[in-house]
């Protein structure tokens, strides 16, 4: 509905503080977006069965390792299927096969989703307007939204601007 769509868009305006994401990491331990200390945080919403994600995530990691990591940028990667389907084996395999161990990877269990619904808490899909994958956000050190729904090129250009460099063409 239009009101639902408006709610999703209003929940994450540029300049606003991003909603915290409290999920489980690959070791089944709680992990929070707000506890990730970095000058900039890239929040990447993705699905290991998404063809576009399979292409973009290795490219994202290459840019991260070549440039961003040296500027205290961290990547907080959120598994998007939300426990509806069990893609955990594919998720863990993709992380391992592509050596994405420098990132913080998180997911929600079916039970966590059910608890959020029972408490009428909005899902991360609502809070971050996730309608496709991959979806990339850039947050500053205080977790304010600097850019949202960015392409990899836009994200890299925005980083270059933040570091007072010339963006790529």
Where are these regions (language model features)?
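N-proximal helix/coil linker or "cap" segments that precede and/or mark the start of modular domains
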Residues: 1-24, 34-35, 65-66, 89, ...
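Loop/turn elements at helix/coil->beta-strand transitions in domains of secreted/extracellular proteins
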Residues: 37-41, 70-74, 100-103, 141
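Active-site-proximal beta-strand/loop segments in catalytic clefts of secreted hydrolases
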Residues: 45-47, 78-81, 108-110
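Structural microenvironment flanking redox-active thiols in thiol-disulfide oxidoreductases
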Residues: 55-98, 113-123
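Thiol/disulfide oxidoreductase modules built on the thioredoxin-like
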Residues: 110-161
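Sec-dependent signal peptide cleavage junction
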Residues: 163-169
């Amino acid at each position: 509905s239009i009101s639902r769509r408006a709610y999703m868009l209003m929940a994450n305006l540029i300049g606003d503080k991003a909603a915290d994401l409290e999920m489980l990491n690959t070791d089944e331990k709680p992990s929070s977006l707000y506890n990730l200390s970095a000058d900039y945080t890239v929040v990447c919403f993705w699905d290991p069965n998404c063809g576009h994600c399979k292409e973009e995530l290795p490219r994202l990691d290459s840019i991260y390792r070549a440039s961003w990591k040296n500027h205290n940028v961290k990547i907080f990667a959120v598994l998007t299927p939300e426990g509806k389907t069990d893609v955990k084996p594919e998720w863990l395999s993709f992380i391992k096969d592509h050596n994405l161990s420098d990132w913080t990877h998180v997911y929600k269990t079916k039970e966590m989703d059910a608890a959020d619904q029972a408490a009428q808490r909005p899902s991360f899909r609502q809070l971050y307007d996730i309608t496709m994958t991959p979806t990339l956000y850039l947050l500053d050190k205080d977790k304010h939204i600097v850019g949202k729904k960015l392409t990899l090129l836009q994200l890299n250009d925005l980083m270059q601007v933040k570091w007072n460099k010339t963006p790529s063409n």
